[in-house]
Design a protein with these regions (language model features):
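Accessory nucleic acid-recognition modules appended to NTPase machines
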Residues: 127-236
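Short, glycine/charged-enriched secondary-structure capping and boundary segments
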Residues: 44-47, 76-80, 236
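Interdomain motor-coupling "hinge/lid" segment immediately C-terminal to the ATP-binding subdomain
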Residues: 66-68, 72-169, 173
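Short glycine-rich substrate-engagement loop in P-loop NTPases that contacts/grips substrate
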Residues: 1-26
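Short, hinge-like loop/turn segments at secondary-structure boundaries
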Residues: 9-10, 78-81, 219-221
Length: 236
């Protein structure tokens, strides 16, 4: 995909329309992978989609991408109400059991990333894969490429500390004391929100009928996949 050529989307769309018309097809499917690599892709998609809607041209569109943050930004900016979001995250236990013969204990500890399944007998290689292919790729390419971050090192430290304490209550004030150049709790809360949007780590608030008490409670940090915690915590 040409990252700077927005017209490429329109060219693809016109080609599909031409094929549909010349073959008298009732409908067609247009699939574009890694759509987030094109600047202002959502504007181009909105333009072509609205044109098809106006002209009653039945072209179904499937947009794929590897950057959740960048995709959601484009969807929320220009395509609100025009799409259905289907998230493809890590695999379920049944999928890992069927494909890799994972036991429940293995799934709980090693998580559900299929690319790392063959490495579970070598902890060093497994940790290196999760670190480079999942953590580094998400933070460096998903978050930092499209989001202005004043302290990138602090963002990474926040994730590492949160992953280490996954499943435990950890107040933002306590995190401030453990991180270098942490700034304030507002900064940390913003970084945790970014990590949540990218599918790495979230902060779960204590359940309460009272919304004020729930929001004021100390969050329980939780990784989305236990493989992310395993990198920072040895097996015990």
């Amino acid at each position: 995909i040409p990252a700077t050529k927005q017209s490429w989307i329109s060219d693809c769309w016109d080609a599909v329309r031409s094929i549909k018309k010349s073959n008298n097809y009732e409908s067609m499917i247009l699939v574009i992978d890694e759509i987030q690599k094109i600047s202002n892709w959502s504007e181009a998609v909105k333009k072509e989609w609205d044109a098809d809607t106006f002209n009653d041209c039945d072209i179904k569109v499937l947009l794929l991408g590897s950057s959740r943050v960048m995709l959601e930004k484009g969807l929320s900016e220009s395509l609100a109400g025009r799409f259905e979001e289907i998230r493809m995250s890590h695999w379920s236990f049944l999928e890992m059991k069927e494909c890799f013969d994972f036991s429940l204990e293995q799934y709980i500890y090693y998580g559900g990333y299929p690319g790392a399944a063959s490495l579970i007998n070598d902890n060093d290689r497994f940790s290196q894969y999760i670190q480079s292919a999942i953590i580094d790729a998400t933070i460096n390419k998903d978050i930092l490429m499209d989001t202005p971050i004043n302290k990138p090192a602090l963002l990474r430290q926040t994730f590492e500390l949160g992953a280490s304490y996954s499943g435990e209550l950890l107040s933002l004030n306590k995190m401030l004391g453990s991180l270098q150049d942490a700034g304030n709790t507002v900064t940390l809360a913003g970084y945790i929100n970014l990590l949540n949007e990218s599918g790495l780590l979230c902060g779960l608030q204590k359940f309460s009928i009272d919304n004020a008490r729930r929001k004021a409670s100390i969050p329980k940090l939780q990784v989305y996949n236990n493989a992310l915690k395993m990198v920072y915590n040895s097996l015990s």
